[in-house]
């Protein structure tokens, strides 16, 4: 019998639990647009009461459609309805004293505030984050701003597009081709990422339990730098060169089958060998140069794919265990059997549009079944009495006292443990001497070098503050030791394919027998069930399967995989699910399984594609470097050369308001073409985009990038130099905020590692306190803590159960 493709929202999760994880927490939402709304949506899903405070005109998101669909009077946009389900709306007119007093009363009753820059109410100094916290010192106040609340750029104009450029994310891991402009990641992803970080920061500050409140300062620039690049500063510091010097398109990558687009990839050397056999060219395996220079093979691979249907390509790739996925978009997403089986998409209770379901699933507690998003000012009277919740223990850092067994590898899983470790948790990173974390070997360090496995820059950046343990749990003695460690841990995080732990007797049901209150986070690529359950998942495949790839690239070419975002985004959402499970355990003493599927997390931040198609029949697609938020918006080549002497310097310009257009005109010297009246409004500029682009390109080509940035910023226009990722460290704003910290490593020396894109007012000190662990560095320490004596530990090493050197499998 066919599985229903969608589910009603009230059926998303069981609804019989007496309390939700965040029951009793009240959050006042003083934000506009996507980032703040997504933050509070995630909190609302967890059971928090969200009171959205709006000026009389309402949040501009109410009338937003990325496809320019007409929102009838009295209705709200479908994206607004998705992001604001289960919230309350209160109108506060800043010009009315009674309303101002009412807002103060509301803030007194709250536990937290989420704030972003916006019109009217939020421009009042008294309603800025410092003013709110000063008047209501019990609150956790989370601010979301382009550059952070302090620093030389804190008041500079920016858009999500220009922030991608500043943070290096517009280049990413050398995305694109050298003969064209770079291409940004479409879909306003930076706003969604900032919203997820804001949710993590808010929950972490609430968990700390300090009675004096806290300011959590989220920087969208730092969020983009964290998630849209691959630790490029640490990479260059350690190895002396950037990961790549030229843009490129992966081969294999996005391929055109006879009836649609598919994504293929080779994340390991073995997968490349298998791919060569699959496409009928085993001779490619004999030429090691082709492994690194595969672009020459692209036409042959394209011809192979073109002779097959999507289903045939995907089936063959699955048979060879080659990472694969269809290229998903808003029109086809809900048609795939895997998503139908898992009921990934749900119907919105207000407008009936398709929405992605929550990005994680919890076994022992519920998420709130969403109720319709509120009309503007729908709740005119609210209870004034603050809800008293159980007193929370006070912690030096948000996760002090939490012990975590980190059974993860590469990026998505270790990212979870890294955030926990930076914020105080005792995180034990588990590897084996025969199968270390694969990211240790990313970077191209020759295996002829001594201790080559200790020189991976990505591992060094992603695992600071952790302790390192090696255990071969394929051996029964190793598996037994894992279980013994679990008895001492609050949390286990793992990101193997589902069958690995299931076959090892280390699944949740087995581990909860030895630790009943265990919180276990499982991070499969596609879920613990469904047709794609056992498919290998790398970041680029998750991007293909979620719509991230579809929105990235030039409209006259195949889409480009962002090639990084799928991993850290999965880690962000797993962290939120984990924090909700911990809140549930704090209330009830009950453990929980958190299923934080990578593709579900990605589908949430690309929700707009499915929503627009379902609600309006609109097909959202990639537009190069243009976008729905601004016109003109594009990259323009500047004068000068890059650090390798190439004519490849670009600036990003985005005019999001009419006022900014007038500023741009002044910066240009008010040339006659720019004074045409049709350009005074967004619609006219959008229609004349080609003409404006040509004029701006000519103006920029005659000027250095820094000169362009200075002129346009002075005129109030969002602008950025397109930064090479490893040059993040040159940004004065990041330097002012201490985004990078120096970390000493016993093998590779001193390098700079990024911190987190949020600052906690009660944790001003450095975040990095220990270098990433050497392989098995803390074996003796940890096994001794477990009660093993030196003779037992020596025997384990002699038998290869533990080790401190990389060895070939026995």
PLM-predicted stretches and their roles:
Residues 182-193, 243, 249-252, 261-263, ...:
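A short glycine-threonine-serine/GTX helix/turn-capping micro-motif
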Residues 246, 250-320, 324, 331, ...:
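Aromatic-enriched alpha-helical interface/lid elements that frame and gate functional surfaces
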């Amino acid at each position: 019998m066919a599985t229903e493709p969608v589910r009603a929202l009230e059926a998303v999760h069981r609804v019989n639990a007496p309390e939700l994880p965040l029951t009793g927490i009240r959050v006042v939402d003083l934000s506009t647009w996507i980032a703040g709304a997504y933050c509070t949506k995630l909190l609302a899903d967890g059971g928090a009461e969200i009171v959205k405070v709006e000026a009389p005109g309402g949040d501009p998101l109410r009338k937003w459609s990325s496809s320019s669909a007409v929102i009838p009077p009295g209705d709200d946009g479908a994206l607004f309805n998705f992001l604001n389900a289960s919230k309350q709306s209160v109108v506060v007119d800043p010009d009315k004293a009674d309303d101002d007093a009412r807002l103060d009363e509301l803030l007194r009753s709250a536990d937290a505030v989420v704030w972003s820059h916006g019109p009217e109410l939020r421009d009042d100094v008294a309603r800025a984050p410092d003013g709110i916290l000063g008047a209501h010192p019990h609150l956790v106040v989370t601010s979301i701003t382009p550059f952070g609340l302090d620093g030389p750029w804190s008041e500079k104009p920016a858009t999500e597009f220009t922030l991608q450029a500043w943070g290096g994310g517009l280049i990413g891991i050398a995305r694109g081709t050298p003969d064209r402009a770079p291409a940004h990641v479409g879909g306003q992803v930076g706003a969604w990422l900032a919203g997820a970080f804001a949710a993590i920061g808010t929950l972490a500050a609430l968990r700390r339990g300090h009675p004096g409140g806290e300011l959590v300062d989220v920087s969208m620039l730092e969020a983009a730098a964290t998630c849209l690049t691959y630790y490029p500063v640490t990479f260059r510091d350690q190895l002396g060169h950037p990961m790549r010097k030229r843009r490129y398109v992966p081969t294999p990558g996005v391929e055109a089958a006879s009836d649609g687009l598919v994504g293929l990839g080779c994340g390991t050397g073995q997968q490349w060998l298998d791919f060569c056999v699959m496409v009928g060219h085993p001779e490619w395996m004999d030429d090691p140069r082709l492994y690194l220079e595969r672009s020459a093979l692209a036409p042959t691979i394209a011809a192979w794919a073109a002779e097959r249907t999507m289903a045939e390509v995907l089936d063959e790739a699955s048979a060879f265990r080659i990472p694969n996925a269809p290229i998903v978009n808003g029109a086809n997403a809900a048609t795939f059997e895997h998503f139908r089986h898992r009921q990934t998409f749900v119907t919105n209770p207000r407008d009936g549009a398709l929405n992605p379901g929550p990005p994680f699933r919890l076994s022992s507690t519920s998420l709130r079944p969403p109720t319709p998003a509120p009309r503007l000012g729908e709740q005119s009277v609210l209870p004034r009495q603050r809800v008293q919740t159980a007193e929370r223990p006070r912690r030096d850092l948000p996760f002090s006292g939490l012990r975590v067994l980190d059974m993860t590898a590469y990026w998505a899983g270790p990212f979870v443990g890294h955030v926990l470790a930076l914020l105080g948790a005792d995180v034990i990173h588990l590897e084996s001497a025969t199968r270390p974390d694969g990211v240790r070997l990313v970077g191209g360090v020759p295996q002829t070098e001594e201790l080559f496995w200790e020189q991976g820059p990505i591992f060094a950046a992603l695992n600071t503050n952790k302790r390192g343990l090696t255990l071969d749990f394929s051996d029964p003695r190793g598996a037994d030791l894992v279980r013994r460690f679990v008895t001492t841990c609050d949390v286990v995080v793992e990101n193997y394919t589902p069958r690995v732990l299931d076959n090892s007797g280390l699944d949740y049901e087995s581990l909860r027998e030895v630790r009943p209150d265990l919180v276990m986070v499982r991070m499969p690529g596609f879920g613990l069930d469904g047709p794609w359950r056992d498919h290998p998942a790398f970041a680029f495949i998750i991007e293909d399967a979620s719509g991230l790839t579809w929105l990235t690239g030039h409209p006259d070419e195949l889409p480009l995989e962002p090639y990084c975002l799928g991993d850290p985004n999965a880690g962000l959402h797993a962290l939120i699910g984990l924090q909700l499970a911990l809140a549930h355990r704090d209330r009830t003493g009950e453990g929980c399984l958190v299923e934080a599927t990578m593709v579900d997390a990605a589908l949430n931040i690309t929700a707009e594609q499915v929503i627009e198609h379902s609600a309006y029949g609109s097909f959202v697609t990639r537009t190069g470097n243009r976008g729905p938020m601004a016109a003109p918006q594009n990259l323009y080549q500047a004068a000068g050369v890059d650090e390798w002497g190439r004519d490849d310097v670009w600036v990003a310009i985005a005019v999001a308001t009419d006022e900014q257009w007038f500023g741009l005109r002044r910066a240009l010297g008010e040339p006659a073409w720019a004074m045409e009246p049709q350009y005074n409004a967004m619609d006219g500029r959008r229609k004349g985009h080609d003409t404006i682009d040509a004029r701006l390109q000519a103006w920029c080509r005659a000027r250095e990038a820094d000169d362009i940035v200075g002129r346009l910023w002075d005129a109030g226009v969002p602008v950025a130099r397109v930064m090479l990722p490893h040059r993040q460290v040159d940004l004065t704003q990041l330097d002012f905020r201490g985004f990078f910290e120096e970390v000493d490593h016993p093998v590779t020396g001193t390098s700079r590692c990024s911190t987190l894109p949020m600052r906690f007012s009660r944790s001003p000190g450095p975040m990095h306190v220990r270098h990433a662990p050497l392989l098995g560095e803390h074996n003796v320490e940890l096994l001794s803590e477990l009660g093993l004596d030196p003779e037992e530990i020596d025997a384990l090493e002699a038998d290869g159960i533990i080790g401190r050197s990389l060895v070939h499998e026995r």
